[in-house]
Regions:
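Active-site microenvironment for binding and transforming phosphate-containing groups
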Residues: 1-267
């Protein structure tokens, strides 16, 4: 079982960070902000419909991402949830049009992780400082949004448990990827919030005075859920210091686009 890795690539101007090994037959990628059609302050590959960008621009950007990943023809099956900074995990088990319509209605009511065990159904979640997590194994994948609320609620571990329950795989077999997010050294939080994280995960989450490492908390949640340490890989990119390549809510003053975490399987 090969260890996961994240490698940069580019297709028609769209920069992707993914695993060319396609673990379990899963195509996965974290997107950046370049290669799209959106105008400032959403320039240019904004994937979020909730930020004030032109809907047509977002639709074209999403098409470009799937095309760059080799799945443009799957655009009509794309599932994008309404992220609410919670810990709800939803599962997609049926890719028929009626079932997908029902799934879209379900995730529109709010969820922050989706497990998918059917082929040809891409899942996309959107980010701008919060941590993105993709899990992949034979038979399925999960994409999760892990901001501080989701992280302290162990959403990555919950998604791992749900994925394994659906696929019958062991947690240690799952490839785990943490995408670009605000790194601990850049993430200043209140003393109270830091204390809450230390109580939940231990001192490893402290990245400095009033600095919180979401990565270490996510790693702990995954390990506690049974993940193999060698199967967890981090992008090593902080959105706060890579604003030319990724969107950062904090650095932009709250007005910006959203990059994405995307995954799908093939028949």
């Amino acid at each position: 079982m090969a260890a996961p890795l994240l490698k940069s690539s580019e297709c028609e101007g769209v920069a992707l960070l993914g695993d060319p090994g396609r673990p379990g037959g899963v195509t996965l990628a974290f997107t950046g902000r370049r290669g799209g059609v959106s105008e400032a302050p959403f320039d240019s590959l904004n994937l979020g419909t909730h930020v004030g960008d032109e809907p047509a621009s977002v639709a074209e950007n999403r098409r470009r991402v799937l095309a760059a990943m080799g799945g443009e023809e799957l655009l009509g099956s794309l599932v994008v949830p309404n992220q609410v900074h919670g810990i709800e995990v939803r599962v997609i088990r049926d890719g028929s049009p009626a079932s997908l319509a029902s799934a879209r209605q379900d995730v529109a009511r709010g969820c922050d992780a989706i497990v998918c065990v059917v082929p040809d159904v891409p899942v996309m979640l959107c980010f701008a400082d919060c941590a993105s997590v993709i899990l992949a194994c034979e038979g399925g994948f999960a994409v999760a949004h892990s901001g501080w609320r989701g992280t302290i609620g162990r959403i990555a571990g919950k998604a791992l448990g749900a994925l394994c329950a659906e696929t019958g795989r062991e947690p240690g077999e799952v490839s785990c990827y943490v995408g670009p997010h605000i790194a601990g050294i850049d993430y200043e939080v209140s003393d109270d919030l830091l204390r809450r994280f230390v109580a939940e995960f231990g001192e490893r989450v402290v990245a400095g005075e009033r600095r919180l490492s979401l990565l270490e908390a996510i790693r702990s949640a995954l390990l506690d859920a049974g993940a193999d340490a060698s199967m967890i890989v981090d992008s090593g990119i902080s959105t706060a210091t890579a604003c030319d390549r990724y969107f950062s809510y904090r650095e932009s003053g709250g007005k910006c686009g959203r990059h994405g975490a995307v995954a799908f399987m093939r028949r």
